Amino acid sequence: MKMKKLLACLLAVSAMVSAVGCNFPFGKTSSSSDSITSEEQGGGSGLAGIPEATVPQEDFQAHYVEGMLHEVNVDYNSPANLNFIKDGQSEYKIVLGASVANESLAYVNKHFGLGAGSMLEKVEALTDDEQENLAVSENSAYVMFGCTYAFEEAGFVMPDYEKIGGTGYYVVTYGKNVFVQAYGAQGYQLGGIALLRYTLGFDMISTTTCVYEKDGSVLPKMEITERPDFDFRQLDNQLIGHDVSYGMGFTTSEMFLNTGTAWMHNVVDFLGGDASLGANDGTNVAHPKWFSNDTNQTQACFTAHGDKEEYALMVENYIQKTIEFMKKRPSTDNIVIGQMDVISNDRVSRCTCASCNAAFAYYGDTNAGAQLAFTNDVSRGVDAWLETAEAKEYFKDVAGIERKEMNILVLVYGSSINPPVTRAEGGALLFDENGKGIPKQQKWFNVDEGGNVAEEDVLDAEGNPVELVCAPSTQLFYCASSANYLHSFYEAENATYSNMVKGWSGLGGNFYVWTYEVNYFNYMYPYNSYDSMLENMRYFKNTGANHLFYQGLYENANNAGFDKLRSYICSKGLFDTSVSYEEVVAKFFKYQFDEAGDIMREYFNQVVQQLRANESYTGGSVHSNDLTKAVVWPEGLIRTWYNMVNEAFAMVEYKKTADPERYEQLWTALTAESLFPRWVLCTTYANSTSFSNESLKDMRRAFAEDFNKLGNTTHKEHFTISDVFTTWDM
C-alpha cells in the first residue's frame, strides 16, 4: 500500500502564514500563445509565443565519478518482517547503544510515529552487559543504533574506518532485527535516513514538504554500506531549519569555526576587531604594518609591508588568536583565514604596499602567494602547539579528543583566486605530466626605509630553496565568484576557472569548494544554474574535493526562482553525484506542489528555456543586473506565467477546507514562485498601459504583504526590500 503524508510540523514558516489564497490583485489574463507576438517574446529567441517546455540536461552528458561507495542491497521479496509497524502497532523496540547515535535514533523514531503511526519503545543499552541482557536473536525484534557488542555477537564485522570514515554507515538486518552502525554522528545521521528511506519511503523535499511513499509495514532484508560522495555537505540556504536540513542529509554540525565576525570573511577577528571601523584594541595603531595600506586599513597585509620583525609578530598573533578560537569551539576542525569581502567598494581587495605588489607580480598577478605563505607559517605554529602536553591535556579534558587536528584554510577568492604557480612567458599556466600546476620557489620581499624592494630566497633549515606548497594542515578553499554558473566547469565558458583548479591542485592540501547558485543582485529572478549543479559536483569530486558549499540564499526564507529545487538538488547530489537530474526534478515537482505539480513543472521548463534562449543578453554572472533586461522578459510571457501560478492555486484551493495544514504549506510554496512574475510586473512594467494606477498600487500592496508573510526581507544581497517599498506609492 502506498502512502504519502506531508508534515506541517516541519514547516518553520507555517506560523507566520495564514491559510488564505495568494493576493492576486487583477484578473486572469489570456494565456494563449496567440496573444503574444514574436516581438513581445523578445530576446532574439526566434520563438513565437510561449517557448516549448524542454527536458533539462540529459544524463548521457554527465561526467560520472568512479569509485564512490554506494553498496545498497535491499530485498522486499524476502523481507525481514512483513509486520514491522502495521496499523499503528509494533512489537519492536528501538535501542540506543552509543550516545553518539542518540540524535539519529530520536529523529528516526519521531518519523516512525509521523509516517507509520507508531513510535517504538526506546531502550538504552550503553554497556556490553546491557546489550547481552537484550538476548538478541534472529527472532527478537530490535532496531539497534550503535549496539556494537550485540552487532559483533551476531557475527557482523564493521567496515574499516578508512572505507566509510566518520560520515559513512553500515545498515544490516539480522533475522527480524536491524543494526545501524557508524563511526560518528554524521554516519548515524545518514544511516538513520537510509533506514527511513527503505521502510517508509522517506524523503525530505523542502521546508514545506516531507514525503512517505511506504506505510512502514515492511522491514526489507538489507545490507547497505555507504559513504557520501562529499563528507562535508554544507547547507546552501542557512535559513533552512535544523530539523529539515538534518533530514535532507546536510552536515548540521559546525564545519568552520566562527571567529566572531563570521566563519569566512573574518581576517579582522585575528587583528582585534573590524579594521575598517578602527580596531577596538588599538592594534592597528600599534602595528600598522599588519594592515593594508589604504586609509581605513580594510584588509590584512600578509607581508607586513616587507618588515620581518613585524611579520614574525603578526604570525605569532594569528597563532595565539587561532588557539583562542579553538579553545572556545574544541570540536570544530576547520578555520578559515579569509580576507574581508569587498561590498559596494567599501574595502580594497588587497594591500598594495611595495612588498605585496612585488609578491603579487612574482606569483603571477595574485595575492595568493603571500597569503598562502603567511597561512603556512600560522598553520605550522598551531600544529606545533597541538603537539604540546598543554594542548593534548586541554582537548582530552574538555572534549574527550585524543588527538586534536586543525585545518587552516586559505580563502582562494577575489585577488587570491589565481594560483601562485609557474607560468609561461605570456602568463599561461604550465602543468606537469599529471595536468597539475607546477609550484614556484618561495620568495620574501624586503622593503627598506626608502621603499626599495629586495627579493630574497626562502630557505629551509638545511639551506635549500623552498617551494611554495601547502603545509601539512593548510588547506585550500576555492571560491570562484566570477565564474559562469549557468555552465559546469567542464564547459568552455569556465575554462579559465577550471585551469585555475588544475593550477591549485599542484600545491597539495585538501580542496574545499565554495560555489554559487543564484544571482546576488537580483533575488527575485530565476538564475539558470539548476542543471549545471550536479555536473559541478561531479567536476569537483573528480578533482579530489571532499567539501562543497553551494552558496544559495541566506537572507530570505522562501525566495522566488525555484530556490527550493536547488536545495533539493544539493541534498541529493552531495550525497550521491550519480543521481539523475531528471529524476530529482520530477520528484520535486510531484510532491512540492501536489496536484499543481504538472503546471508548475511546465512553468519551470518554460523559464529555463527562456533563459537559455537569451543567455547572450543575461550572461552568467552571479553579480550582474543583466538578468533583469526587459528584452528577456516580455510582458505577455510574464503574464502567462503569472496566470499559470494562479491556475496552480485553483487546483489546490479545495485543500483550504479539506486539509488546512497542507494548504498552508502549498500557499508558501506557490506564493514563493509567484514572486518573480509579480515583481517584474511591479517594477519593469510598472508603467504598462495594461493596468491602471490603482491596480498597480493594489498589486504592489499585495506583493509586499505576501513577501513579508513568507518571512523574506531582501531583494538583493545586503539590501532590504523595505528600501524599495518606501519608493512605491501604495
Predicted regions and their residues:
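Catalytic domains of carbohydrate-active enzymes that cleave complex glycans
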Residues: 544, 570-730
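Acidic, contiguous N-terminal accessory segments
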Residues: 27, 36-170, 217-223
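Bacterial signal peptide processing site
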Residues: 23-25
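Structured mid-domain segments that build the active-site/substrate or prosthetic-cofactor binding neighborhood
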Residues: 301, 309-316, 320, 324-327, ...
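Gly/Pro-rich turn-and-neighbor structural signature
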Residues: 313, 319-507, 515
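Feature activates predominantly on carbohydrate-active enzymes
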Residues: 91, 95, 99-107, 111, ...
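Sec-dependent signal peptide recognition
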Residues: 4-12
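C-terminal motif of bacterial Sec signal peptides marking the signal peptidase cleavage site
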Residues: 18-21
